[in-house]
């Protein structure tokens, strides 16, 4: 044990938090989570251990601007003005200090290993009693599962130790410091340490004791470490469970270790051996180690599809069977290897349907509870994810147990990121920082290697590539050859990775950055000598209204076997709840706490909102990742299973044929598909519709029974096909009265029955409509070529750093947002059966014509207004965001009904998950409440829209809400939006894609640009 004077002054003078060579003092060696059962049956059934005690709850707390401001007296007694906080928590979530959101830029001046003298410091204290029996024999430990960023610990006024690395446990032996009766802990937590330079992840920077704190009593002679591994014969019919056990304490001849393997109540195998390891070298082996190997016939294999778990119980006992201590862990029999360029699980090539996940809660910051963890896993499984990357640090220990149980493949990532360094590998190539990096990697492996869900180790994130990475790669491969190692830094394909794991590489487009080119994923596979699998560690940046082009990735993944999927960035929006002056909650992002530097809303890239409500993009991910694929030939549906191990046993295929959303025929067929197999389903003769319309066949795969992760009736996959249909023939209608045209100096007015249309002759716009005496418009109907910018449109552009390449800056510079209409023509003609209004507008900015819009409005005797629009786009202006019409309707109706793609928001490059049907939703559901307001709520492929007394027919896209594009563009947070009078309707003939390969460069694929130069669309507007 390292000895140090107990006084606070001496500790402060040492400044351990500014020494990369000091990562801990007196911290115990890493190991898997322990419970120290004294009853093997309790270990087998994973009952709460009587030897473990939680210290979570209310602690006394005092905050200081720097450690030097902490009074020495605090070591002995609580300060008179100390507050009470809950542990675990981040102190910023309790009003102390401010959370800081920054992506790349360090939140402190970069001068490693030194940190600011103004270093916020939290002083925690707790009094507690210890059971007398714990003091008589054995060792009492205290375990801090996570403290950010560094801390010193005192017990009863005596200094115990020091720890850093905020995402792994720090465990100390308290035995020598405890006494009978009341004991007092004092924990001084520093916000910044030299470790902060290794923790530059894209997340909120918070502080405090934010994971569990507990006491554990172990016997003097104890199990100090154990790890398990599984090995197989060629066909996986026989396995060996290898258990390596290490003890601490007096090494006696009578000591034995028994390892027993259980499947529920059944013991599958057992073995007993004395200590004494295998011969290592000419000096012998480890006297305190023993390795046992248990043979298992026909093991039930673990996978994310079928997460079969056994239970291994490790007993330390005497030769006569007297139990000293038991530890245990769940065991999954599975094998991970790379062979012939493929990542294999149990001999089958994986397709990673992955997502990156930060530990984030909108109310609790970085504190994770079991309910939130389970909620995340259930949502992932329900949306066809099978893998999660712990970005960018080891997670709460419980997370891995839950992933074992529910079935998720895990990339376990070391808590290392130096993104803000110039160059990025400034620390990772420096041998002085190797000890700190080594502890972060080796301790992660030692804690988590018993989990079957962990199939890949990661050396960290965005830290360049340095010699320290190479050393740690070799250490992992030596200690744990059963798992591949991945690391993206330095180009994603260095010698420190078994997997090509780029971030944001595109499907077909090279990004030839200097030193670290980012090739297209297809090209990467064909580079000379490259034989590794490619799995994107990050792709499809889901920031706000995003995930356009996602289907293109999945087409490539299914086409090229060595493209084995990737991890979407990312799972959850990292917004935090704040409260206004009236106590109302609102969602905050970077800068909202006065935090500088900050990266604004870049913390919100999730497929789900912070409260876990899904973004519409999540449905697109679910559909593209679905485990059943379909094809149609005639009346035969071919169903292909992409499950590798699971035979379908809880799936029904529901099919339905509908004409314009009206069902004509339906049925259901049980699915009986072998892993990676096919099933042909012959549909009956389908009825021929008597009328014209769109005829669609839709199939859904439904789970009739509940599972551990889904309710009964869960839909796991779906597909639609448009079928051959009758031609639409419009027969001459019976004669109607001809609308009456009247002309004044200012207007053309058309009147028919109780309806009137008014066109302003000066503007050329439809300025008003009446039904009876009720006005229908609050603003004229006019062309629209812009949208409230998406995050993907903005990129990295901001007021202090304009990116001229961003779409929004190109549109602004060209004048798209400022363009004004110059009327070139406005005429009215009475035809034999209708009135025809013709207008021509030139949309101009600073004397330049950007768009020319020619429109005709034909109002016939039935009261229908047929609008025909032809738009020419100037060749020297950026491709517009949309080509359409907009107006503010006077009505606010409760519901919206449409025939088209839905029900969720969809865009031209994100619509494969949308189905054609007749949909009916509340008006409020047509708006997507992105925290940073933007264009939202579009529905594509629309043939008919009904709202209030109005109906629109044609082939168009629309969104409808209480918020104008102008308000969305000018508002920084969704809670600041106010419902406007009436309803804003946007009807687009054409809409640009939204992109999503990344959010900092233009990422809309060329096929989704509005680049044609001239556009034509038609619309029929009538009243019901």
Curated annotation (Swiss-Prot):
Site (Transition state stabilizer): 358, 392
GO molecular function, one term: carbohydrate binding
Keyword Hydrolase applies: yes
Keywords: Glycosidase, Hydrolase, Magnesium, Metal-binding, Plasmid, Sodium
InterPro entries linked: B-gal_small/dom_5, Bact_Beta-galactosidase, Beta-gal/glucu_dom_sf, Gal_mutarotase_sf_dom, Galactose-bd-like_sf, GH-type_carb-bd, Glyco_hydro_2, Glyco_hydro_2_AS
UniProt-annotated binding residues for substrate: 103, 202, 462, 538-541, 605, 1000
UniProt-annotated binding residues for Mg(2+) 2: 598
List of residues binding Na(+): 202, 602, 605
Pfam families: Bgal_small_N, Glyco_hydro_2, Glyco_hydro_2_C, Glyco_hydro_2_N, LacZ_4
Residues annotated as the enzyme's active site: 462, 538
Domain of life: Bacteria
EC number: 3.2.1.23
Binding site for Mg(2+) 1: 417, 419, 462
GO cellular component, one term: beta-galactosidase complex
Enzyme class, spelled out: hydrolase
Cofactor note: Binds 2 magnesium ions per monomer. Binds 1 sodium ion per monomer.
Catalytically driven reaction(s): Hydrolysis of terminal non-reducing beta-D-galactose residues in beta-D-galactosides
Keyword Hydrolase applies: yes
UniProt cofactor(s): Mg(2+); Na(+)
Biological process according to GO: lactose catabolic process
PANTHER family: BETA-GALACTOSIDASE
Assembly and interaction partners: Homotetramer.
Family membership: Belongs to the glycosyl hydrolase 2 family.
Protein name: Beta-galactosidase
Lineage: Bacteria, Pseudomonadati, Pseudomonadota, Gammaproteobacteria, Enterobacterales
């Amino acid at each position: 044990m390292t000895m140090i004077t107990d006084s606070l002054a001496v500790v402060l003078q040492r400044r351990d938090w500014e020494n990369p060579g000091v990562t801990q003092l007196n911290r115990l060696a890493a190991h898997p989570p322990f419970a120290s059962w004294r009853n093997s049956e309790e270990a087998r059934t994973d009952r709460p251990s009587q030897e473990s005690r939680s210290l979570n709850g209310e602690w006394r707390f005092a905050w200081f601007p720097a450690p030097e401001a902490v009074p020495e007296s605090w070591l002995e007694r609580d300060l008179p003005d100390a507050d009470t906080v809950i542990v675990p928590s981040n102190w910023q979530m309790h009003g102390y200090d401010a959370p800081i959101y920054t992506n790349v830029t360090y939140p402190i001046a970069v001068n490693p290993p030194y940190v600011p003298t103004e270093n916020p410091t939290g002083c925690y204290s707790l009094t507690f009693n210890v059971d007398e029996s714990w003091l008589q024999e054995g060792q009492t430990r205290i375990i801090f599962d996570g403290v950010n960023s560094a801390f010193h610990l005192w017990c009863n006024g005596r200094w115990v130790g020091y720890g850093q690395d905020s995402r792994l446990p720090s465990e100390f032996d308290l035995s020598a410091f405890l006494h009978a009766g009341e004991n007092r802990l004092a924990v001084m937590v520093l916000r910044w340490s030299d470790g902060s330079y290794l923790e530059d992840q894209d997340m909120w920077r918070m502080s405090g004791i934010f994971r569990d704190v507990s006491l554990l009593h172990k016997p003097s002679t104890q199990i100090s470490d154990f790890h398990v591994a599984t090995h197989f014969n060629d066909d996986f019919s026989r396995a060996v469970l290898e258990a390596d056990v290490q003890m601490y304490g007096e090494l006696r001849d009578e000591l034995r270790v028994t390892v027993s393997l259980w499947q529920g109540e059944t013991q599958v195998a057992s073995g007993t051996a004395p200590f004494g390891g295998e011969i290592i070298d000419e000096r012998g082996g480890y006297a305190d180690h023993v390795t046992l190997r248990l043979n298992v016939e026909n093991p039930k294999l673990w996978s994310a599809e079928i997460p079969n778990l056994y239970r291994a119980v490790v007993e330390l006992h005497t030769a006569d069977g007297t139990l000293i201590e038991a530890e245990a862990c769940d065991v999954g029999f599975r094998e991970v290897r790379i062979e012939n360029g493929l990542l294999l699980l149990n001999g089958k090539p994986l397709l990673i349907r992955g997502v990156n996940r930060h530990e984030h809660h909108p109310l609790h910051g970085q504190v994770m509870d079991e309910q939130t963890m389970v909620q995340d896993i259930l949502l992932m499984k329900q949306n066809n994810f099978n893998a999660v990357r712990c970005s960018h640090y080891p997670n709460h220990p419980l997370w891995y147990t839950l992933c074992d149980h529910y079935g998720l493949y895990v990339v376990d990532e070391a808590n290392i990121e130096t993104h803000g360094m110039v160059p990025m590998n400034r620390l990772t190539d420096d041998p002085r920082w190797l000890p700190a990096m080594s502890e972060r990697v080796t301790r992660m492996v030692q804690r988590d290697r018993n989990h079957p869900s962990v199939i890949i180790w990661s050396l960290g994130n965005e830290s360049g590539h340095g010699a320290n990475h190479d050393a740690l790669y070799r250490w992992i491969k030596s200690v744990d050859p059963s798992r591949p190692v991945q690391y993206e830094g330095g180009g994603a394909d260095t010698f420190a990775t078994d997997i090509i794991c780029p971030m944001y590489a595109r499907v077909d487009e090279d990004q030839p950055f200097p030193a670290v080119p980012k090739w297209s994923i297809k090209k990467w596979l064909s580079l000379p000598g490259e034989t590794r699998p490619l799995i994107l560690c990050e792709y499809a940046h889901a920031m706000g209204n995003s995930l356009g082009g996602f289907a293109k990735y999945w087409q490539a993944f299914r086409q090229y076997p060595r493209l084995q999927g990737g991890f979407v960035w990312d799972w959850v929006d990292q917004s935090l709840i704040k409260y206004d002056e009236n106590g109302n909650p609102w969602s905050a992002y970077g800068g909202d706490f006065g935090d500088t530097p900050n990266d604004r809303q870049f913390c919100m890239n999730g497929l789900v909102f912070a409260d876990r409500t899904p973004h519409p993009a999540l449905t697109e991910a679910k559909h593209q990742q679905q485990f059943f694929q379909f094809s149609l030939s005639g009346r035969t549906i071919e169903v292909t299973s992409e499950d590798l191990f699971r035979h379908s046993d809880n799936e029904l295929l529901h099919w339905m044929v509908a004409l314009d959303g009206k069902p004509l025929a339906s049925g259901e067929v049980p699915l009986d598909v072998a892993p990676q197999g096919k099933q042909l389903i012959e549909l009956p003769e389908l009825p021929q519709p008597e009328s014209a319309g769109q005829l669609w066949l839709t199939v859904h795969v439904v789970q009739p029974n509940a599972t551990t992760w889904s309710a009964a009736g869960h839909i796991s996959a779906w597909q639609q096909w448009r079928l051959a249909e009758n031609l639409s023939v419009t027969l001459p209608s019976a004669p109607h009265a001809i609308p009456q045209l009247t002309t004044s100096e200012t207007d053309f007015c058309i009147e028919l029955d109780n309806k009137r249309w008014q066109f302003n002759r000066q503007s050329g716009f439809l300025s008003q409509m009446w039904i009876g005496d009720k006005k229908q418009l609050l603003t004229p109907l006019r062309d629209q070529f812009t949208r409230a910018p998406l995050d993907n449109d903005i990129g990295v552009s901001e007021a202090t750093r304009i990116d001229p390449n961003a779409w929004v800056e190109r549109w602004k510079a060209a004048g798209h947002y400022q363009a004004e209409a110059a009327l070139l023509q406005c005429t009215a003609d009475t035809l034999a059966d209708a009135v025809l209004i013709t207008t021509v507008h030139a949309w101009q900015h600073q004397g330049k014509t950007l768009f020319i819009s020619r429109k005709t409005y034909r109002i016939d005797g039935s009261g229908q207004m047929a609008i025909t629009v032809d738009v020419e786009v100037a060749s020297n202006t950026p491709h517009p965001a949309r080509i359409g019409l907009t107006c503010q309707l006077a009505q606010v109706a409760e519901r919206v009904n449409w025939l088209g793609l839905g029900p969720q928001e969809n865009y031209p490059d994100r619509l494969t998950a949308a189905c054609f049907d007749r949909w009916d939703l509340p008006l409020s559901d047509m708006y997507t409440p992105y925290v940073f307001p933007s264009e939202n709520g579009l529905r594509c492929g629309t043939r008919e829209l009904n709202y209030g007394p109005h109906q629109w027919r044609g082939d168009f896209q629309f969104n409808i809400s209480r918020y104008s594009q102008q308000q969305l563009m000018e508002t920084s947070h969704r809670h600041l939006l106010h419902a406007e009078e009436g309803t804003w309707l946007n009807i687009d003939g054409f809409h640009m894609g939204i992109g999503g390969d990344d959010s900092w460069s233009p990422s809309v694929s060329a096929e989704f640009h509005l680049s044609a130069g001239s556009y034509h669309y038609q619309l029929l507007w009538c009243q019901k």
